[in-house]
Amino acid sequence: VVHPALEPYVRAAQVRPEPHPATRSTSERRNSFRSEAVFVAGASQPMQDVIDGEIALGDRTLASRLFVPFDDEGKALVLFFHGGCFVMGDLETHDALCRRLATDTHMRFLAVEYRLAPEHTFPAAVDDAVDVVKYVAAHRGEYVRPDAALIVMGDSAGASLAAVASALTRHEGLGIAAQVLIYPTLGPEVVTESSHKYATGYLLELDHLRYDYRQYLGDWSDHTDPRVTPLMFDDLTGAPPAIVLVAQFDPLRDEGVAYAGLLEHFGVSVELLEAEQMVHGFLEMGAFVPATLAVVDDLAEHLHRFVQESLT
């Protein structure tokens, strides 16, 4: 069963499902997503410094936010891509999560926005993620010590972008120490046992995600492209070591497990973590489900140890 603190939300979702995204405007959905994310996240961790900035990538500029924790060890910079089904999300929706992870890991976090659908369809978000990874790798001294480890992280849709960017740049000598994939979505047509069991009533409605994939892909019809469906990569040799976090009652659970297995198949070191009794998006629900904070702390502990070992 789901965690007792989550039961009221799951029951409510089953009794009164969220309106189908086609019935609301994109701006309305984004505003609602932002308001709800900030509300359920709760109080923010204080930081030594929070610096809003921009990353110029030739023909486009992306908003960024650097989080510097009070006990920053200067050993790593975590580049973070937010979730939101490729349609929603921004620096505000994941501000509290980045702050807590920065505090718990003693690492700097750099959250970066990317172009969203439907205004910008595939491969705009992927191009942004890849270009941001390359830019930050080349300019890491602007954000942290030049010799610091670089980690690429994301949740949900952001985890898909983190996975793709890590895979596509794996032979470019960027010095990416790790990729951290938090309940990743890994394709528009992935069918698994968990996608059947938890397709509806567990806070992520699978048909809503499928709808957003259609918004994201636009006229792009090749779903076997690994940039769309990372599970289709035919070689991941040399990809950065990975931490993959999945939630027990998430329709995306099994595809996250499958991607961890695919990475391992190609010789990549993987730590697979499963959050029991949890649902998709639980990491951002600290205000109402305090048990989620323990999982955030556990993830941070794994990441901190991961970096310590990689630097020795």
Task: Provide a role label for each language-model segment.
Residues 1-69, 308-312:
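A glycine/proline-hinged amphipathic helix-loop "lid/cap" segment
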Residues 74-84:
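Short beta-strand element of the alpha/beta-hydrolase
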Residues 120-142, 299:
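Alpha/beta-hydrolase active-site loop
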Residues 148, 163-312:
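Alpha/beta hydrolase fold serine-hydrolase catalytic domain that processes acyl esters and thioesters
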Residues 143-156:
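Alpha/beta-hydrolase fold nucleophile elbow
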Residues 92-111:
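Short amphipathic alpha-helix adjacent to the substrate-entry channel of hydrolases
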